[in-house]
Each structure stands twice: as C-alpha cells, then as structure tokens.
C-alpha cells in the first residue's frame, strides 16, 4: 500500500482520507516514516527555510483561545506590554539576519490590530528594510484587506494566520472568533499579493483523526507553509493539565502531514523544546523542512546556531530561496 501511495503522489495524485486513517493505525510506522522521507526529498529537495519572530505586543488579548497565555480571560503569568518601537524591532531583525535566518515576523497579541497600530508597525517594517535584507512577515490577527495592503506596501511579503486545529475541534477551544474569519483574512492577504503561512497546534486533546482532518483542511485552502506547534501546557490556561503526545504520535502526525501536503514547508514551531534531540532529528528526516528559531513568544524556543547545525547534520541546506506560491483561492 505504501509504495502505491508513494507512486501516486509522485505522479501528481493525492492521499485519500481512508488511506491516511489506515496509515495512522498501521503497526509498521517505520515504513510510513521512510515513505514520508522520500516524498519530502522528491518534492522539496534539501532546502530548509528559517524564520524568526518578535513578540511585538504581549498579553491582554480579548479572545478566549484555551491554549493561549496571552488571553486576558485566564490567569497565566506572562509579561504584558504594548507595541515595541521600530528601533527595537529593526535591531532584532538585523541580529537574526546576521545569524543566517531568512525571515522575520512581528507577532502581536489581540483579535486584530487597530489602524493606528498598523501604521506604527508599517514604520517598524520600513526601519527593518533599511537595516537588513531579511524577508518580512506579519502575524497580527484578523485583518482587513485595507490593513493588509498597508503592510504589503511597507515590505511585508508573508502573512501568518494559524487555523490552529481541525474544523470539527476548533469551536471547543475558542468561542470569540471562527475559522471562517481566519480564512477571510488569509484570502484578503492573498488578494494584496502576500504569501500565506498557516498551521496550528497539536496535542490539545484532539484525536489522530482530527489531526488528519486538519492536514486535509490546510491542503484544501492551498497552504504551503505549515507551522506545527506542540502544545506546551501553560499554568493558568484551561489546557494546563493536558497530557503530552507520545513521540510516536508526534512523528506519525508529521509523516501524515507530509503525505497530505507533499509540497509544503512543514515548520518546527512552539513547544519543540519538549522533544528529545533524537526525535527532532527523526522529525526532520521524516518531513520537517523549516523552523522558527530563536525565542518563541511565551514558550521556550531553540537558538539559531544550534538549529543551523542540526539542519546541516540532517543533510539539509539552510537557504533564503524558499518562496512558495503567492495566490490561489481569492
């Protein structure tokens, strides 16, 4: 079965839902991992994409996402502050570029950014572009096309908006906005000319079937940069007592995401520090070919130099030439 699926993918076909469910329950996980490895190398070669972020505005978010320490609905202990200055953002971007990182994103808490905040961040992006040639991304919540156009005009080429989890599971985790609102933001970003980055968090209590549903959903909306965060339960949030995924569950999820999205950059993201070095290497072997590196929001990230070495040891080349397609469904 694995060889049949692999041949079909190479010839332009797709994995079916029924096949994904069978692979998830198969006892021969190594065969699944090897197939995902070969598909990764066939479609994506040895390129590895890197990006970094700065938490440009922290805390006091009005949304009630159950996993998130930024929400003001919960009692998580995090630092809270307003927008960072353009000088601070530009300095961090230049520092990350010197470390060999290809992309840099401002990330801000909140449902959306006000027009005044958008103008302030446009100033930050202009300052970044004056300091360095790093590619600019943004993750600022649910934005209108008008606001996205301002960002695009000031150097932002990629917009990040995580769909977070399977459509069947999302309503149990967040009641203050919907995935349809996220999709509207993604489509607006594409209309102004931006690329899109959208993934989510695994290990929030969803089933393997829902992870597969999520992977197919991302495929259906043509996402080609997929951050795969691992829940790091944060004290004070509703998910603080959630049990961690097993290593096999995590690696199986990566393999299935690869077979369902063979042309995507699957990105190490938040919570990765929970994985052992051996599991991180195995994940890269199976299908991870991008990473957020540096300090990640309110969880512990991975330092750039260590990540660069890991990527090279796993047979990949860190490169800035990793653009994905710009426009699909408007």
UniProtKB/Swiss-Prot annotation:
<keyword id="KW-0411">Iron-sulfur</keyword>
<feature type="binding site">
    <location>
        <position position="267"/>
    </location>
    <ligand>
        <name>[2Fe-2S] cluster</name>
    </ligand>
</feature>
<dbReference type="GO" id="GO:0051537">
    <property type="term" value="F:2 iron, 2 sulfur cluster binding"/>
</dbReference>
<dbReference type="GO" id="GO:0004076">
    <property type="term" value="F:biotin synthase activity"/>
</dbReference>
<feature type="binding site">
    <location>
        <position position="65"/>
    </location>
    <ligand>
        <name>[4Fe-4S] cluster</name>
    </ligand>
</feature>
<dbReference type="GO" id="GO:0051539">
    <property type="term" value="F:4 iron, 4 sulfur cluster binding"/>
</dbReference>
<feature type="domain" description="Radical SAM core">
    <location>
        <begin position="43"/>
        <end position="272"/>
    </location>
</feature>
<keyword id="KW-0479">Metal-binding</keyword>
<keyword id="KW-0004">4Fe-4S</keyword>
<protein>
    <recommendedName>
        <fullName>Biotin synthase</fullName>
        <ecNumber>2.8.1.6</ecNumber>
    </recommendedName>
</protein>
<keyword id="KW-0808">Transferase</keyword>
<feature type="binding site">
    <location>
        <position position="105"/>
    </location>
    <ligand>
        <name>[2Fe-2S] cluster</name>
    </ligand>
</feature>
<feature type="binding site">
    <location>
        <position position="197"/>
    </location>
    <ligand>
        <name>[2Fe-2S] cluster</name>
    </ligand>
</feature>
<comment type="pathway">
    <text>Cofactor biosynthesis; biotin biosynthesis; biotin from 7,8-diaminononanoate: step 2/2.</text>
</comment>
<keyword id="KW-0001">2Fe-2S</keyword>
<comment type="similarity">
    <text>Belongs to the radical SAM superfamily. Biotin synthase family.</text>
</comment>
<feature type="binding site">
    <location>
        <position position="137"/>
    </location>
    <ligand>
        <name>[2Fe-2S] cluster</name>
    </ligand>
</feature>
<comment type="function">
    <text>Catalyzes the conversion of dethiobiotin (DTB) to biotin by the insertion of a sulfur atom into dethiobiotin via a radical-based mechanism.</text>
</comment>
<comment type="subunit">
    <text>Homodimer.</text>
</comment>
<dbReference type="GO" id="GO:0009102">
    <property type="term" value="P:biotin biosynthetic process"/>
</dbReference>
<keyword id="KW-0408">Iron</keyword>
<keyword id="KW-0949">S-adenosyl-L-methionine</keyword>
<dbReference type="InterPro" id="IPR002684">
    <property type="entry name" value="Biotin_synth/BioAB"/>
</dbReference>
<dbReference type="Pfam" id="PF06968">
    <property type="entry name" value="BATS"/>
</dbReference>
<dbReference type="InterPro" id="IPR024177">
    <property type="entry name" value="Biotin_synthase"/>
</dbReference>
<feature type="binding site">
    <location>
        <position position="61"/>
    </location>
    <ligand>
        <name>[4Fe-4S] cluster</name>
    </ligand>
</feature>
<feature type="binding site">
    <location>
        <position position="68"/>
    </location>
    <ligand>
        <name>[4Fe-4S] cluster</name>
    </ligand>
</feature>
<dbReference type="InterPro" id="IPR010722">
    <property type="entry name" value="BATS_dom"/>
</dbReference>
<dbReference type="Pfam" id="PF04055">
    <property type="entry name" value="Radical_SAM"/>
</dbReference>
<dbReference type="InterPro" id="IPR013785">
    <property type="entry name" value="Aldolase_TIM"/>
</dbReference>
<dbReference type="InterPro" id="IPR006638">
    <property type="entry name" value="Elp3/MiaA/NifB-like_rSAM"/>
</dbReference>
<keyword id="KW-0093">Biotin biosynthesis</keyword>
<dbReference type="InterPro" id="IPR007197">
    <property type="entry name" value="rSAM"/>
</dbReference>
<dbReference type="GO" id="GO:0005506">
    <property type="term" value="F:iron ion binding"/>
</dbReference>
């Amino acid at each position: 079965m694995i060889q049949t699926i692999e041949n079909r993918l190479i010839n332009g076909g797709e994995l079916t839902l029924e096949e994904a469910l069978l692979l998830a329950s198969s006892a021969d996980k190594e065969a699944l991992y090897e197939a995902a490895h070969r598909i990764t190398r066939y479609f994506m070669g040895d390129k590895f994409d890197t990006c970094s972020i700065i938490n440009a505005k922290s805390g006091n978010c009005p949304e009630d996402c159950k996993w998130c320490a930024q929400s003001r609905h919960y009692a998580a202990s995090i630092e809270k502050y307003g927008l960072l200055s353009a000088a601070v953002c530009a300095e961090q971007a230049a520092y990350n570029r010197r470390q060999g990182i290809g992309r840099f994103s401002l990330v801000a808490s909140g449902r959306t950014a006000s027009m005044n905040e958008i103008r302030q961040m446009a100033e930050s992006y202009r300052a970044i572009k004056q300091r360095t040639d790093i590619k600019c991304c943004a993750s600022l919540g649910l934005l209108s096309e008008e606001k996205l156009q301002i960002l695009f005009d000031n150097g932002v080429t990629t917009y990040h908006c995580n769909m977070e989890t399977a459509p069947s599971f999302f309503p149990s985790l967040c009641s203050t906005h919907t995935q349809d609102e996220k999709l509207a933001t993604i489509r607006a970003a594409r209309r102004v000319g931006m690329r899109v980055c959208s993934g989510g968090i695994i290990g929030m209590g969803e089933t393997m079937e829902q992870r597969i549903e999520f992977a197919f959903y991302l495929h259906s909306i043509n996402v080609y940069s997929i951050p795969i965060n691992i829940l790091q339960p944060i004290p004070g949030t509703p998910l603080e007592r959630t049990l961690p995924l097993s290593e096999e569950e995590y690696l199986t999820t990566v393999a299935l995401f690869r077979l369902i999205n063979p042309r995507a950059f699957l990105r190490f993201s938040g919570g990765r520090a929970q994985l052992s070095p051996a599991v991180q290497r195995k994940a890269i072997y199976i299908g991870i070919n991008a990473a957020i590196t540096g300090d990640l929001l309110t969880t512990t990230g991975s330092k750039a130099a260590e990540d660069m070495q890991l990527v090279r040891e796993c047979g990949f080349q860190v490169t800035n030439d990793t653009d994905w397609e710009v426009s699909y469904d408007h």
